[in-house]
Amino acid sequence: MALLKPLHDLSLRFPDYEKFDLAAQMRRACKSIPANIAEGYGKKRSARDFKAYLANALGSTNEMIVHLQIAKALGYISGEESESFVGDYRIVGKQLTRLLERWR
């Protein structure tokens, strides 16, 4: 959740023509990570069920990394901003991967 507000604010700086494209995709992807974890935990009837939601959260994490790289390539964010957010999302990805591997 700590990344949600800074990422949302970052996406609002994108050009108007990206409002319903890359910026919106980024906002949806960053929100889906904690939402999938919470929904999966709330609906867990088995380890398999919860892991499916964790896998979706991991997919959204990887999607965020790509969106940030695209935003950098298009000049919407600086290299520093991209590296910082990408590093944070890589950490989230590693945490989700470990949780997926260890959840019983």
Residue ranges of predicted features:
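Amphipathic alpha-helical assembly/interaction segments
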Residues: 1-104
